[in-house]
């Protein structure tokens, strides 16, 4: 309406105080005006129940519960997310997973502290032995589930703390130390997104996810986005070989910002064209 030039005066539309409302009803009897403005409005207020639409979670994300297909029980979201991610990762990159993939998944699911805590437990090892055992343990701890990860980090925090931690202090420190999709409580949100995208894809509609989701390798492995945020690389759909470096040992991502721009290459094992992937996000 403000775009219409014939409007010359605009009525006051602000929320009025009680006194202003009584003044606006001054053409009525004083007692009747008071009843309309004060008494009746309070009667309506008393008839309205207070409900908490979104529970107060103290500043942390509100994580809804996700029902299973039978509509009766609820999904164990951390378990489902972990299974989806590692099933797809193994299908693309093989089993065991390359160290770089294992580390990326661990960081995106729970933060850096999981691998840090494992290396602390293996401080007597060094070199290649430390590397092999660290990533083996990282995989085992995460695949065993959320409780396994929490116990691992909880133990590390307790052993490395400079002060004595009671149970409450330890849990607060654990909560502050963990990050990532599951560690920060975003797993139900990701699972809901995965279901929405899958339903859309099943109906024949492509969903193009970008932004923060497009840069999440976990989201890629869950099928939420078609964007692979890893650096440019080749991967074989048959033997699961992945190549992130050229013949001289230089990262392919240093030359190619997008894996789609990589030159065609044949798998040395299967002699079929390698898939070109990775958008370095």
Enumerate the language-model features and the residues they cover.
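Phosphodiester-processing cores and adjacent nucleic acid-binding clamps
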Residues: 1-281
């Amino acid at each position: 309406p403000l775009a219409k030039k014939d409007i010359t005066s605009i009525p006051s539309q602000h929320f009025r105080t009680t006194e202003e409302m009584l003044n606006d009803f001054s053409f009525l009897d004083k007692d009747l005006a008071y009843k309309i403005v004060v008494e009746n409005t309070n009667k309506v207020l008393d008839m309205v129940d207070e409900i908490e639409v979104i529970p107060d979670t103290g500043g942390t994300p509100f994580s809804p519960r996700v029902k299973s297909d039978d509509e009766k029980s609820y999904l164990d979201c951390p378990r489902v997310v972990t299974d989806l991610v590692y099933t797809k990762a193994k299908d693309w990159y093989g089993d065991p997973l390359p160290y770089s993939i294992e580390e990326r998944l661990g960081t995106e699911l729970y933060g850096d502290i999981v691998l840090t805590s494992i290396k602390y437990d293996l401080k007597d090892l060094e070199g290649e032995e430390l590397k092999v055992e660290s990533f083996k343990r990282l995989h085992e701890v995460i695949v065993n589930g959320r409780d396994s990860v929490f116990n691992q980090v909880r133990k590390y925090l307790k052993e490395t703390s400079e002060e004595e931690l009671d149970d409450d202090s330890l849990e607060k420190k654990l909560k502050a130390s963990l990050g990532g999709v599951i560690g920060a409580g975003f797993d139900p949100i990701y699972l809901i997104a995965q279901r929405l995208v899958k339903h859309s894809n099943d109906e024949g509609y492509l969903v193009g996810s970008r932004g923060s989701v497009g840069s999440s390798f976990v989201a890629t492995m869950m099928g939420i986005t078609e964007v692979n945020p890893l650096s440019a690389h080749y991967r074989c759909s048959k033997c699961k070989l992945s190549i992130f470096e050229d013949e001289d040992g230089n990262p392919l991502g240093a030359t190619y910002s997008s894996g789609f721009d990589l030159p065609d290459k044949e798998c040395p094992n299967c002699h079929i064209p390698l898939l070109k992937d990775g958008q370095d996000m």
